[in-house]
């Protein structure tokens, strides 16, 4: 049976064996239960949890398609097209609506991510529904993987990650005359496709999300002994996100 180490997996080692994915995790019983719930609800485009292998790794079904990094560079037009923006929004709406039924179980705790915000809760957040975790087939969104960071939360909190990494212009080549109108259009397209109004403070929500999840939580986990988060600090990921936050504070108003 063919074995292939998959690209990505910044937090866990990921190996494809045959048609399934074997992932080394720290043990996420609530995430496993949530994926089984989504399967029962008939939600397509998400991995199915199949059990554990002889090494104790989680086994998931493989989602065929292309992803950012192995197949697309971060600035590939496909990833930032109007179609992709709307596809991601519709996918997140489908996922969030289905997840509401899991809330009574979810609020009992036991999630792998201990840093989720206080209630009230509306749905189950994917936790890292950024563009690099979506799967594309024929340049259209076909699925979403890496549910290890899932936790109870609000819709807008989860959408902040998806929106910011897909529709917001990059800070390193930003030109308001070229990028501001496109960003404004795509932000509106995103929320129209999701079916909820764009909150007037969406830029602030994104800033809070990036600051908390991508900066503060990474530092806290590294301090607690998480080796992968320590690698992220060494690699300079926090500096990238801090620059992104400064970019949002300076230019975000131009997109509203």
Label every model-predicted segment.
Residues 12-16, 114-158:
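Active-site acidic catalytic loop and adjacent metal/ATP-binding pocket
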């Amino acid at each position: 049976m063919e074995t292939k180490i998959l690209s990505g997996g910044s937090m866990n080692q990921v190996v494809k064996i045959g048609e399934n994915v074997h992932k080394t995790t720290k043990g996420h019983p609530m995430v496993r239960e949530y994926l089984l719930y989504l399967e029962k609800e008939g939600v397509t485009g998400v991995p199915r949890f199949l059990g554990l292998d002889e090494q104790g790794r989680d086994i998931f079904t493989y989602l065929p398609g292309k992803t950012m990094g192995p197949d697309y560079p971060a600035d590939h037009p496909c990833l930032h097209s109007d179609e992709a923006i709307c596809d991601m929004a519709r996918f997140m709406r489908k996922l969030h609506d289905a997840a509401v039924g899991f809330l009574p179980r979810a609020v009992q705790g036991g999630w792998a991510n201990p840093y989720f915000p206080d209630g009230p809760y509306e749905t189950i957040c994917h936790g890292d529904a950024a563009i690099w975790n979506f799967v594309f087939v024929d340049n259209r969104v076909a699925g979403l993987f890496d549910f290890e960071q899932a936790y109870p939360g609000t819709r807008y909190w989860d959408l902040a990650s998806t929106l910011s990494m897909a529709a917001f212009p990059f800070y390193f080549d930003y030109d308001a005359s070229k990028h501001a109108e496109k960003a404004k259009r795509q932000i509106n397209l995103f929320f129209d496709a999701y079916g909820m109004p764009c909150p007037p403070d969406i830029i602030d929500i994104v800033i809070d999300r990036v600051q908390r999840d991508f900066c503060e939580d990474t530092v806290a986990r590294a301090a607690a002994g998480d080796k992968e988060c320590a690698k992220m600090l060494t690699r300079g990921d926090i500096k990238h996100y801090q620059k992104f936050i400064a970019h949002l504070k300076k230019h975000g108003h131009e997109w509203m």
